[in-house]
Amino acid sequence: MAKPLWLSLILFIIPVALAVGVDQSKNEVKAQNYFGSINISNANVKQCVWFAMKEYNKESEDKYVFLVDKILHAKLQITDRMEYQIDVQISRSNCKKPLNNTENCIPQKKPELEKKMSCSFLVGALPWNGEFNLLSKECKDV
């Protein structure tokens, strides 16, 4: 016999309610699960890196597209969404902007155009809805 729909909903909502709390006095969401390391090969991490780089390249004034060389570290925190803190190493590619497809791009080989950076991105995500927001980014030359 099938479970009633309401029972399934309750069983789904309880863990979510336990994971996130609201401070009524300040009317803001508090993290119940503080940043913890996660595997850099996690599918959601890869989606967030793709999104962060798309935003980075859109906002960058550089003439060339930057690509991820390596994902260095990833952390996850659960609030009213999933927040991913991701550290990456990126480099300038041989592809000029604007560009929608980076499949044929490779890191820049000309010494005068080579540039590597270390970046930390904070991405808010509801991956099951396809919703991503770049909450912060910090990059420095390597």
Swiss-Prot record:
GO terms for molecular function: cysteine-type endopeptidase inhibitor activity. Induction: Testicular factors or hormones other than androgens present in the testicular fluid may be involved in the regulation of CRES gene expression. Its main location: secreted. CDD domains: CY. Proximal caput region of the epididymis. Lower expression in the testis. Within the testis it is localized to the elongating spermatids, whereas within the epididymis it is exclusively synthesized by the proximal caput epithelium. Glycans are attached at residues 39, 100. Keywords: Disulfide bond, Glycoprotein, Protease inhibitor, Secreted, Signal, Thiol protease inhibitor. A motif (Secondary area of contact) lies at residues 77-81. One of its GO terms (cellular component) is extracellular region. Residues 1-19 form the signal peptide. It is found in: Secreted. InterPro entries: Cystatin_dom (IPR000010), Cystatin_sf (IPR046350), Sperm_Mat_Cystatin (IPR052691). Belongs to the cystatin family. Performs a specialized role during sperm development and maturation. PANTHER family: CYSTATIN-8 (PTHR47010:SF1), CYSTATIN-8-RELATED (PTHR47010). This is Cystatin-8. It comes from Mus musculus. The gene is Cst8.
